Amino acid sequence: MSVIQKLIDDQDNQDLKAYNEVLSEDYYWLRHSTGEKVPRDELSKWLISPDAPKTESSRIIYENDEIGVAHYFISFKDGSRQAVLVAYIIKDGKIIRSETGATNIPK
């Protein structure tokens, strides 16, 4: 199974331990909106929480041992939706960084 698919499945299954095993200890998510670096533990707790955005659909565009690209449609509690493109940097079988770009989808 691909690293990205495992990450997607672990998030869908709300499995925090398995989710964190896919990410390196020094992993961070570079937020597209602010440039802030969000560390693994902070991101994973949010994504597995009841306040997390819901993934409507996902697809892996490309993945090899060094990089992966995936596209998601997500929805938020307030009813807003986004199309999100994520680039994952992979090293030694773990994701070490991800960066996102998002487009708001009109209601």
Predicted regions and their residues:
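Amphipathic alpha-helical repeat scaffolds
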Residues: 4-9
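Short, well-ordered alpha-helical segments enriched in acidic and aromatic residues
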Residues: 13-28
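A beta-strand edge to alpha-helix "cap/lid" segment located at domain peripheries
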Residues: 12, 30, 34-107
